[in-house]
A protein has these predicted regions:
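N-terminal active-site segment of His-dependent metallophosphoesterases
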Residues: 1-50, 55
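Active-site-proximal beta-strand elements of phosphoester/diester hydrolases
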Residues: 2-10, 118-124, 190-192
Length: 218
C-alpha cells in the first residue's frame, strides 16, 4: 500500500488523472488524500468529482471548498447563489447535476487529518497557538505571518513554525510554490500547491517512499 497526498487540484481533472497514472495508483490497494480546493477555477470540476469517487479520495477543506459550500447552501435555500464571480458560476454550472450530493459531501470534509505519520491541512496552522487553537479561517486561508489579509507577499507562517508534528503537509499557497523543509535529513513540512490551474504543475507526495512526483499542467 502507498499513500499519495496531492496538492490543490482546482478542477484540473486531466492532470489529476495523469498524476494518479504516474504513481501507478490502485484504489483497491492505495490511499489518496487531497489538500483541498479540488473543484473551483479549473476547467473540469465534475471530472475531478468522478476521480475523487472512483479512487476513494479523502480531503481536507479549502477556502474555495468552503465558499462553494456556502453557495450550494444558497442554492438549496433560495434557488440561486449570492455574490458569485464568473469562475464560480462556471464551477456551479459544471457541478449542477451533483449539487445536493456535493453539498452533503463537503459538510463531511474535515479541516485537518491528523495521524501518527502526518498532519494534513489546507493552508496551515497558527504557528504560535498550535493545531488545537487554530481558528477556522486560519486553517483555510493562513499564508503570511503575521497575517495580512489578502496579501501574498511577506514571511510565511511556516517560517516561524517549530515542528511538533512528524510531517505537516499543506496546500493553498500557489504563489509560494513547492515548499520542502527538513530536519536531520527528514522532511517535516511540505507545501504541495504548485499552481496547476495557473499553468504550472500538479504535485503529489508518496508518503512511504518519501518522494515527490509532479505532472505539468496541460
Amino acid at each position: 500500500m502507498q499513500t499519495l497526498i496531492i496538492g490543490d487540484v482546482h478542477g484540473c481533472a486531466r492532470e489529476l488523472s495523469d498524476l494518479l497514472n504516474k504513481a501507478h495508483f490502485s484504489p483497491s490497494r492505495d490511499r489518496l488524500l487531497l489538500t483541498g480546493d479540488a473543484f473551483s477555477r479549473g476547467p473540469d470540476p465534475l471530472g475531478v468529482w468522478h476521480l475523487i469517487n472512483a479512487h476513494g479520495a479523502e480531503m481536507v477543506l479549502g477556502n474555495h471548498d468552503a465558499r462553494l459550500r456556502e453557495q450550494l447552501d444558497d442554492i438549496s435555500d433560495t434557488g440561486s447563489p449570492s455574490r458569485t464571480k464568473p469562475d464560480q458560476r462556471f464551477t456551479l454550472h459544471a457541478l449542477e447535476s451533483i449539487h445536493s450530493t456535493l453539498r452533503t459531501w463537503l459538510y463531511r470534509v474535515p479541516l485537518y487529518i491528523e495521524e501518527d505519520r502526518f498532519l494534513l491541512v489546507h493552508a496551515g496552522i497558527n504557528p504560535e497557538h498550535g493545531l488545537a487553537n487554530t481558528r477556522f479561517e486560519e486553517f483555510i486561508t493562513i499564508r503570511t505571518w503575521p497575517p495580512v489579509k489578502g496579501s501574498i507577499d511577506g514571511p510565511r507562517w511556516h517560517d516561524v513554525y517549530e515542528p511538533v508534528h512528524p510531517l505537516l503537509i499543506f496546500g493553498h499557497d500557489a504563489p509560494g510554490g513547492l515548499v520542502t523543509k527538513r530536519r536531520d535529513g527528514k522532511p517535516y513540512l511540505l507545501g504541495l500547491d504548485t499552481g496547476c490551474v495557473y499553468g504550472r504543475a500538479l504535485t503529489g507526495y508518496l508518503l512511504e517512499e518519501e518522494r515527490l512526483i509532479s505532472t505539468a499542467s496541460r
